Amino acid sequence: MKIASIDIGTNAVKTKIFETGPTLIKFIQSERSPIRLGKEVFIEGQIPKEKLDQLVAILKNYKEIFESLEVRDYEIVATCAFRDTKNSEEARRFIEHSIEHPIRIISGLEEAKLMRLHPDAENNQTDMFVDLGGGSTEIFMREGSELAIGSFNLGAVRNMLGMDKPSEWKRLQRFLEKHKKPERIIGIGGNIRSFIYANNVKSMNQNKFLKSAQAMQSLSIEEKMDQFNFSPDRADVIDHAIIIFSFIMQKSGCKKIKSTKWGVSDSIAVKLFHEIYSQKIKIIN
């Protein structure tokens, strides 16, 4: 049985499709559609009608893909842009009625907690998982039997627009200083994947990371596109994302970072997988 998930993010909309069985979930394919909902949200306070129409068109296209592949069930979640927009409920209802499918707007802390579904997160006491999106940064870490989770209004698009607040940087610093020093950061999101891939490595130590970040910041948007084959909506925000990762590395004392292909859409699909197949379990009490 095929299932899918859709993540309506601040910089783009992403979907992933999976084949499943009672004990297996296997990735098949993905789609990404740049839309940058966060630009109007962070500057004007709400998502305009033309952007909602674009979003509807993207989601209808995804539905057609699902139908052609015989996807049985799927879930749609929206993150920071929908959390922050003044017309959140109105926008959600408009989208739901247009595509005839529910959308769930998840909180920053729920988004952070979803990282526990990453295959490497179970019983992992050494790594810090950092999901850096267009509008916010989520952190997940295990400390003994407790979970350390945080959500901060610092993101690649938000910071590019100069809408990040000093108080949020201070709050992030307090969080990092409060919790234990991780041995490694697992970076989630397209910016950190693109940055590490551009350096032709699988992981980087702090010194190499900071030097490479400085080198990339010296390049123009056009140079980033030419040298690394970045898309325009990656080239203009990647420096702002890497600045946040650099801050997290330095303030946490972490000396190593790697990226992962995992994202919100993967976690949502795994969550849906468990919900579907748990219904087939007979419970006796």
What are these regions (language model features)?
Residues 3-7, 127-131:
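Short glycine-aspartate micro-motif
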Residues 4, 17-20:
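Active-site neighborhood of HAD-like aspartate-dependent phosphohydrolases
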Residues 34-35:
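Short, glycine-rich, amphipathic interfacial segments at transmembrane boundaries or analogous
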Residues 23-28, 146-148:
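Beta-strand initiation motifs
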Residues 17, 40-71, 79-117, 121-126, ...:
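Helical "lid/coupling" subdomains associated with nucleotide-phosphate turnover
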